[in-house]
Structure formats: C-alpha cells, structure tokens
Amino acid sequence: VNALKTLSAVGIASIFLLAACGNDSTEEDSAEAGGDINYSEEVDYTITGIEPGAGVTETANNTLDTYDNLDGWELEESSTVGMLAQLADAISNEDPIIVTGWIPHHKFLQYDLKMLEDPEGTMGESESAHTITRLGLEEDMPDAYKLLDAFNWELDDVEQVMYEAEDSDVETAASNWVEDNPDKVDEWTENIEEADGEKIEIGSMPWEAEQASAAVMEQVLTEYGYDVTVTEVDPAILFESIAGDSVDATVAPALPITQGHLYDRYEGEFVDLGPNLDGLQNGFVVPEYMDIDSIEDLEPKE
C-alpha cells in the first residue's frame, strides 16, 4: 500500500511539473505573438502616406520632426489610392502598418482600425465641417437658407454614404441614405416650403467626405423643388467663389485648422452658419490587432 501511495505521489508531481512546463511554453509563445513585437522595426520606421500636397501630409511631416522617438523615421508619400491598397494588403496578411488617416473615412467601416494617441497634438485638433453661405442668400432664398442652417449629421452617417459609394456612386449612396433616414431629414426640412425651380449652386471639394455631404444636400434640396448644381473646386477657389457671390453655399470647409487660413482671408465676406459635422480628425492609423495605442509607443531608428 505504501508503495502504491509513493507511486501515486510521484505521478501527481510529474503531472504538475509537465503542466508547469507547458504553461511556460504557452506564455513564451504568447509573448512572442503579442507585446514583444517591435512594430517600429516591422514597418521599417516608415509611415505610409498619401499625396505630397495634402494637409495630412504636412502635419505628418511636422509630427516626425516633433517627436524625439520618431528620429530616423520617414513618410512614404504616395496617393490615397496607393495608401489604401497597401493598408488592404497588410490587413489581409495581418502585417503591421502605420498610415496617415483621417476621420471621416469609409475605411473605418471596412476595417477594424484605431487612431494613435497624439500627446503633442501635432496631427491637429479635432475639427468640424461648417456650412457657409454667400452674403444675401437668406434674403434671396430664405427656405434654402433655413434648410442649410438646420443641416447636421454624424460621422457614422457620412461614412455610410462614403462606404456605399465605393460600390456605386456618391449620388446613389446619398439618395439611399436620405431614403433610410427620414426622421433626420424631417428635422432639417421642418417648416420649409417647396421651391419652384429656383437655381442654387452648392460648392464642394474633390474629396470623399465633402462629396458625400454635398450629394446629400443636393438630394434634399432637389426634393424640395430647387434646381441644384454641385461644383467641385479647390478650397481656395471655393472661398473666393462664396465671397464673390458666384457660389451660394457650401457644407465642406473643415475648421478651425484645415481651411482656417482661407476663412481668415475672406472673413466678413460670407455667413458662417456653424458646424454641420463634428469630430473630423487627422492622425496615424493602425489596425486594431497592433498592440500599440500612442505615437509615443513607437521607437527611434537606431
């Protein structure tokens, strides 16, 4: 009996020993797969960017110059299409990647992404898209003016239009959004009388979020009897056109930073109806599977 007890004790001890060894191995594997990854080295100390002339490109370069831990890093300038292709390829293989990004954008619906914290604030503070009109629009088209003044929506709304437009076109996506959101549209159009074919020109910019906002406004104004023209131009030309009364209104300008210099240049020559979309933000964006949360988590190139 004593011999059996001894054998049993030895067997149990062996089981615990084997289990402990197994746990050590599992923990090591987990560490190798998770927090011990040098993401800075994995992305070759490179931020994947977009066009050289874009505002986010300028702020990204400023960020590389500001953070000491980004010493030796480079911004790979490309195009928006090129950046999105590299992002899609990295995510399909669960590879690390850091890209210049902005909110709103349909990629946040398409993928699980996060924007890295920016303690120095070099990528810019959160902004809002504003509705501005030419002087005199309230007197000339009071109902259109009231509708423009009431226009307000959320990031999820504009990203939904942008996402759907990837597989169709922005006009179709905007029409579907208006049809699916009658309560919100009813808030904008409360006490608005239908027009009788009055012409109104909405200015926009050649980027997806701005196109989505303009397309939704075009859809609603058209349903209320206006003959709407949407014109896409460079931001500088847009502000000049509003100030010169050749464009009636826009829902596009990002303030106070991105188009702030144009706002200051023409201030007093237009009417600012205030924000229609809050939460616009530029930043460094990574997939959720990357175990970093801040720009300060990155390491300098040695």
Regions found by a protein language model. Name each.
Residues 107-149, 274-283:
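Periplasmic-binding protein-like
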Residues 45-46, 50, 54-59, 142-189, ...:
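Ligand-binding clefts/hinges and TM-proximal coupling segments of bilobed small-molecule sensing domains
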Residues 22-25:
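Bacterial signal peptide processing site
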Residues 32-48, 134-136, 145-146, 152-155, ...:
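A conserved helix-loop-strand patch within extracytoplasmic ligand-binding domains
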Residues 75-86, 207-208, 229-241:
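Short helix-initiation/N-cap motifs at beta->coil->alpha
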Residues 16-20:
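C-terminal motif of bacterial Sec signal peptides marking the signal peptidase cleavage site
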